[in-house]
């Protein structure tokens, strides 16, 4: 049996531990990062568990980072994406059950009539994890309203720079711009924080 409940602040450690081992999660889905937007959105994130045997010791199998806006649930209103975060053991069949349970919970417990679902781009998965895309169409009768683009740089097979890109890099160097790798996240976080506040 699948059970669904809303996330509470008391669940933060369990949430983050699940995100750390999930097959399709990124740091954006950690509660510390998601909490950055807590003053702008009403959190309606869900925790989905499988209950076996006598109902004791439910096992967390999925998370749905989400915000609620009236009778609309968005996955996630404050992030670029926020689809179903899945355990590595989840099967397509179980994912169908998960979405059926989420649908029932949202309709009956939260008064949700519409869901905007932004899946986690496959480039961030540690292993294939698109069961949610199948289940949301099959169970929820979802339809695609739009597509977003996700870009990445493949570090082990870099594309060659164009001549224009070389000129731009040389110009940046002449003007004192440097790019360097560091383990100190403080400077990056300051730039990120300022950019997010400007939005």
Predicted regions, residues:
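Active-site rim helix/loop that mediates acceptor-substrate recognition in acyltransferases
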Residues: 23-45, 195, 199
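Conserved GNAT acetyl-CoA-binding A-motif
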Residues: 110-121
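Acidic-and-aromatic substrate-binding clefts and catalytic sites of carbohydrate-active enzymes
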Residues: 123-129
């Amino acid at each position: 049996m699948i059970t669904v409940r809303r996330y509470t602040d008391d669940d933060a450690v369990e949430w983050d531990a699940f995100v750390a081992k999930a097959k399709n999660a990124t740091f954006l889905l950690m509660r510390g990062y998601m909490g950055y937007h807590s003053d702008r959105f009403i959190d309606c994130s869900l925790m989905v568990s499988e209950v076996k045997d006598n109902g004791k010791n439910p096992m967390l199998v999925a998370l749905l980072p989400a915000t609620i806006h009236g009778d609309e649930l968005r996955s996630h209103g404050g992030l670029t994406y926020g689809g179903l975060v899945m355990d590595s053991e989840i099967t397509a069949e179980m994912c169908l059950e998960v979405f059926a349970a989420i649908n029932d919970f949202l309709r009956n417990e939260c008064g949700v009539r519409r869901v905007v679902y932004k899946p986690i781009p496959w480039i961030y998965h540690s292993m294939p994890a698109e069961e949610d895309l199948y289940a949301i169409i099959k169970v929820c009768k979802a339809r695609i309203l739009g597509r977003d683009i996700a870009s990445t740089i493949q570090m082990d097979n870099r594309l060659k720079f164009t001549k224009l890109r070389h000129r731009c890099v040389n110009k940046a160097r002449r003007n004192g711009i440097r790019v360097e790798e560091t383990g100190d996240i403080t400077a990056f976080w300051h730039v990120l924080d300022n950019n997010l506040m400007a939005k």
